């Protein structure tokens, strides 16, 4: 059996995540290529979560996120993201771990196939009737449904949550809608005290082809594709980390186990000890085939 070490895995992650001076992301076009390479990543590094992120790819190394807004890596990260919002190059919104996530359009149908959506703009009514959507999320969704794209300030007003006392409820509901792949930011407006506010729209209107593409994908296939893509990027992870990574997709432990079992049967992944890592790790055989 092939023996792997944590050092070998970390070297491959440095390459995959573009955390090297040679592969660092230097332009907006390279940022777009990076998202298409990894298919999904976080915007920022998230403590305790193994996943590529755009900030480290721009920095070309692991570094703390600085507080200074004039830091060159921070400026590129924010600026390129804002410039790309209306380009329809990728999905950007709160998703994995309920944090800012970028997803390639090639991979987005697989995430959508695991959501509660079927592609109709009125799907939300059944979710609300079933108790799967909060009243605040319903109000925000209906404001966008009626008025089209709205900046955050006007969206709060149209959803009748403009009072300061309603801000936390509004923010939670907006994250709920993004995690549910119903709403996403599509631009930036000069609104509010800071003259900066996201412009939001309904995902099926912004990406009308995604629901139809997702209809061709079973939930089981979607889980297999996403878990395997994740392992191709991170090289190795245990079952607990995979569960944490995809917790918002509402899979049961049994569904995750079945997904992993199929990947093991296909020899797409192998479960093994890795020197320097605790417990059994699921390792991508595609990654193992590279020059680790």
Map each language-model feature to its residues:
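Long, low-complexity intrinsically disordered regions
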Residues: 1-292
């Amino acid at each position: 059996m092939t023996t792997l070490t944590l050092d070998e895995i970390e070297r491959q992650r440095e390459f995959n995540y573009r955390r090297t001076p040679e592969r660092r992301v230097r332009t907006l076009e390279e940022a777009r290529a990076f998202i298409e390479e990894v298919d999904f990543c976080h915007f920022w590094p998230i403590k305790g979560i193994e996943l590529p992120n755009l900030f480290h790819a721009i920095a070309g190394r692991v570094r703390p996120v600085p507080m200074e807004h004039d830091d060159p890596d921070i400026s590129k990260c924010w600026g390129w993201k804002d410039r790309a919002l209306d380009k329809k190059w990728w999905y950007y919104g709160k998703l994995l771990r309920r944090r800012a996530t970028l997803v390639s359009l090639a991979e987005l149908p697989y995430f959508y196939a695991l959501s509660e959506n079927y592609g109709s703009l009125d799907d939300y009514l059944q979710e609300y009737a079933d108790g799967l959507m909060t009243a605040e999320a319903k109000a925000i969704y209906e404001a966008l449904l009626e008025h089209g794209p709205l900046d955050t300030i006007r969206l709060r007003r149209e959803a009748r949550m403009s009072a300061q006392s309603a801000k936390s409820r509004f923010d939670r509901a907006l994250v709920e809608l993004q995690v549910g792949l119903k709403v996403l930011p599509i631009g930036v407006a000069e609104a509010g005290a800071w003259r900066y506010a996201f412009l939001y729209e309904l995902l099926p209107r912004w990406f009308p082809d995604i629901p139809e593409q997702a209809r061709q994908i079973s939930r089981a296939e979607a889980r297999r594709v996403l878990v395997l893509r994740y392992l191709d990027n991170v090289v190795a992870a245990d079952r607990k980390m995979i569960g944490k990574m995809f917790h918002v997709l509402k899979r049961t432990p049994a569904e995750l186990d079945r997904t992993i079992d199929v990947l093991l049967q296909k020899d797409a992944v192998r479960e093994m000890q890795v020197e320097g890592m605790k417990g059994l790790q699921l390792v991508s055989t595609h990654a193992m085939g590279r020059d680790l």
